[in-house]
Amino acid sequence: MAAMMASITSELLFFLPYILLALLTFYTTTVAKCHRWRRTEEKRRCPNLPPGAIGWPFIGETFGYLRAHPATSVGRFMEEHIARYGKIYRSSLFGDRTVVSADAGLNRYILQNEGKLFECSYPRSIGGILGKWSMLVLVGDPHREMRAISLNFLSSLRLRAVLLPEVERHTLLVLRHWPSASPAVFSAQHEAKKFTFNLMAKNIMSMDPGEEETERLRLEYITFMKGVVSAPLNFPGTAYWKALKSRATILGVIERKMEDRLQKMNKEDSSIEEDDLLGWAMKQSNLSKEQILDLLLSLLFAGHETSSMALALAIFFLEGCPKAVQELREEHLEIARRQRLRGECKLSWEDYKDMVFTQCVINETLRLGNVVRFLHRKVIRDVHYKGYDIPSGWKILPVLAAVHLDSSLYEDPSRFNPWRWKGNASGVAQSGNFMPYGGGTRLCAGSELAKLEMAIFLHHLVLNFRWELAEPDQAFVYPFVDFPKGLPIRVHRIAQEEEKSVLTVDI
């Protein structure tokens, strides 16, 4: 009996590879037939797909699309594909059949039809890092609810009364700690990141800059960010794995803040404070704990990362355009003189609204630097546009950078020219071709705060410092925009009596 069982086992082991091969062949054949049937059905429904190429199996053309390139260009991949196929072409990116759009009209059409023909669809790895309740990945009613909370917290009234003074206070805290010895050399990108992180940590959770807990959170956040832009390989030691660990640590800090407030409320029989977003979300919404945690983490990411890079880009572009710096300084000197005549030492909302050329500089920085390069969307209904058929189920990437750098829309698009926005002579801001914060129902909720941060920081920067690059550096896309060397600058303090420093403001 034992010999018979051994013989059967031996025969099974002998045939096992053939059985597995047969099963694998059956599986791959079935999958291939399903794909062929689906593509045949798509071609029947959508016979006029955009031109393009699929690239390698599984990976498609993803590596080429994400190849590092200067932030002030669309990169070699996009340039070659646009030249070969036009501004609308098909590809295979991030594991999906994809239509890539460098067409201004189609990009507007996509953003205007959010929830009708298209919906937000980021790679799963992004949701794994930011959380399933992150505003970046939510769609439909959950997204609208989260966005409404953010918009209410960032209302115009709050911008004027609370956030403007907070932005100025944090600006002065950063600039006062710049080395007093002149000239001094340091990373402008690091300083911009420190400024925006401390500002967001204060307004999200009332965490003060310089505190040990705040600094620990900032270091955890740096590790977290490295995972956001890494390959989603969840193995010990990988950037993604470390980011998930940092995410858990950051959420633990937020959760402890929530518990402390609930205990304080129960102990003192008082309501939850609303001085920050955490208190606002706990009192003004019916969100669960998990939803609040993901909301705060995603806003820390969105409010810190993009704003800090935009500010670093402004410092970089201005360094190469002395004429713009001079006009900027003249505008802010006039604002400072009016402050002194009023007997005031802090910026008012009226001062901010008078920063007209500053807004031109901000617009041009966002156009040329393109902090947000493209958006992830999915087609939810068959779309017919400019003679092309785009099937439902496909991904579509509206490339905002390609529109901002389009020579048919902007004269000499690779040149930093803030005067193109002055008086809006070209009408570009109202044309729908300028979309640095997205558009439609998913327009960035913090766009006004981001512009306020840049304007206030530039006000105090140009009044008190001159700067130049300490060594050559340039913004690259990796796929997020970053300065390889951290944008090292050499800074000189301004000491003229007429341009008296305002860093002595009592804060």
Curated annotation (Swiss-Prot):
SUPFAM superfamilies: Cytochrome P450 (SSF48264). Belongs to the cytochrome P450 family. Its EC number is 1.14.14.178. Pathway: Plant hormone biosynthesis; brassinosteroid biosynthesis. InterPro entries: Cyt_P450, Cyt_P450_E_grp-I, Cyt_P450_sf. It holds the Pfam family p450. It catalyses: a C27-steroid + reduced [NADPH--hemoprotein reductase] + O2 = a (22S)-22-hydroxy C27-steroid + oxidized [NADPH--hemoprotein reductase] + H2O + H(+); a C28-steroid + reduced [NADPH--hemoprotein reductase] + O2 = a (22S)-22-hydroxy C28-steroid + oxidized [NADPH--hemoprotein reductase] + H2O + H(+); campesterol + reduced [NADPH--hemoprotein reductase] + O2 = (22S)-22-hydroxycampesterol + oxidized [NADPH--hemoprotein reductase] + H2O + H(+); campestanol + reduced [NADPH--hemoprotein reductase] + O2 = 6-deoxycathasterone + oxidized [NADPH--hemoprotein reductase] + H2O + H(+). GO terms for biological process: brassinosteroid biosynthetic process; brassinosteroid homeostasis; jasmonic acid mediated signaling pathway; leaf shaping; response to brassinosteroid; unidimensional cell growth. One of its GO terms (molecular function) is oxidoreductase activity, acting on paired donors, with incorporation or reduction of molecular oxygen. Its cofactor is heme. Involved in reduction steps of the biosynthesis of plant campesterol-derivative steroids, ending to castasterone (CS) but missing brassinolide (BL). Catalyzes the conversion of campesterol (CR) to (22S)-22-hydroxycampesterol (22-OHCR, 22-hydroxyCR) and of campestanol (CN) to 6-deoxycathasterone (6-deoxoCT). It is found in: Membrane. Keywords: Heme, Iron, Membrane, Metal-binding, Monooxygenase, Oxidoreductase, Transmembrane, Transmembrane helix. The lineage of its organism: Eukaryota, Viridiplantae, Streptophyta, Embryophyta, Tracheophyta. It is a single-pass membrane protein. It comes from Brachypodium distachyon (Purple false brome). Heme binds at C444. This is Steroid (22S)-hydroxylase. The chain crosses the membrane at residues 12-32. GO terms for cellular component: endoplasmic reticulum; membrane.
